[in-house]
Amino acid sequence: MVSYSKNVFVPLTRLCRNRCAYCTFRREPEEVRSPYLSPEEVFEIVEKGKEAGCKEVLFTFGERPEERYDEALEWLEEHGYSSTVEYLVDLCRRCVEEYDMLPHSNPGVITKREMRKLRRWNASMGLMMEILSERLCEESGPHEHSPGKRPEERLKVLKYAGELKVPFTTGILIGIGETWEERVKTLEEIQRMHERYGHVQEVIVQNFRTKPGIPMEDHPEPTPADLLRTVATARLILPDVPVQVPPNLNRETGQLALLAGANDWGGVSPVTKDYVNPEAPWPEIEELKRLTEDVGFRLRERLPIYPEYVRRGWYHANISEVVERLSDDEGFAR
């Protein structure tokens, strides 16, 4: 069985305190009309998602832009918020209360207190480990200008999620200059945390894709064989954790990834594009079904919180009514 979640993607802000060399998502203040999407803009997107049968609202955005840009801080203060996370909590609450949809937030590096607040209104949360390497944070490395990409900062958030019993999505980004040993070490660190807390609901193996205009524009992409070897390795290191491969980044190799050990396609949106990889459109659900069944698997829709964690009751009372309404007896989407 291979799972996926039908979602709507909300790019809350494209300002970010980090400047990763492979990113095409972030913008400078002068490049955007407003530092943040307004509540009206957010819920226009959410409404379209609900009409299309989506159950997940995916909030992905730049990390703590108010620490770097006065424009971001001023916008938040004008709208009655002290931080991006505080604004996000309010939006997540409204997604649940007004739209019967389940948020999944990728807020970047946050404090334990912030995560506790988000947990009240999120079915799950996520933070990629990328590659846990101090070397990549050094001069000329892809994370040189990204304080939020320090390995100890990423691991701290993964630990908080375990302590707070947050169903958590994490993963690795391959092909950004890491060694094979660094790749394996990152997967082993994720497994170590999962063995301790049991909270890692999925691990994404995401391949770097070059894009015009980024500092790593001329950096080679990982080969299909490299991706498949990494998927197989992730399956061996994390035997009990679902492994996800994004289908829009792997149209030619996605089926082979399933045979190598992947068993989840991740979030797929019939409404919004992948703002992180805008050049790579989502496949239609019917195409995804065909790709999955052609190699002998069955496609099944899930919620942003994985079935195991639905069955365990790993969600806050604030969202319990919506989780139970949207899930079946096995914890998958109705």
From Swiss-Prot:
Reaction equation(s) it catalyzes: 5-amino-5-(4-hydroxybenzyl)-6-(D-ribitylimino)-5,6-dihydrouracil + S-adenosyl-L-methionine = 7,8-didemethyl-8-hydroxy-5-deazariboflavin + 5'-deoxyadenosine + L-methionine + NH4(+) + H(+)
Binding-site list for [4Fe-4S] cluster: 16, 20, 23
Domain called Radical SAM core: residue spans: 2-248
Top EC group: lyase
Gene Ontology molecular function terms on file: 4 iron, 4 sulfur cluster binding; 7,8-didemethyl-8-hydroxy-5-deazariboflavin synthase activity; iron ion binding; transferase activity, transferring alkyl or aryl (other than methyl) groups
Cofactor(s) demanded: [4Fe-4S] cluster
UniProt cross-references to InterPro entries, sorted A to Z: Aldolase_TIM, BATS_dom, CofG_family, Elp3/MiaA/NifB-like_rSAM, F420, rSAM
Sorted UniProt keywords: 4Fe-4S, Iron, Iron-sulfur, Lyase, Metal-binding, S-adenosyl-L-methionine
E.C. number: 4.3.1.32
GO term, biological process aspect, one: sulfur compound biosynthetic process
NCBIfam families from the UniProt entry: F420_cofG (TIGR03550), PRK06245.1 (NF004884)
PANTHER family: 7,8-DIDEMETHYL-8-HYDROXY-5-DEAZARIBOFLAVIN SYNTHASE (PTHR43076:SF15), FO SYNTHASE (COFH) (PTHR43076)
Family the UniProt entry places it in: Belongs to the radical SAM superfamily. CofG family.
Function comment: Catalyzes the radical-mediated synthesis of 7,8-didemethyl-8-hydroxy-5-deazariboflavin from 5-amino-5-(4-hydroxybenzyl)-6-(D-ribitylimino)-5,6-dihydrouracil.
Subunit: Consists of two subunits, CofG and CofH.
Name of the protein in its database record: 7,8-didemethyl-8-hydroxy-5-deazariboflavin synthase
The species this protein was found in: Methanopyrus kandleri (strain AV19 / DSM 6324 / JCM 9639 / NBRC 100938)
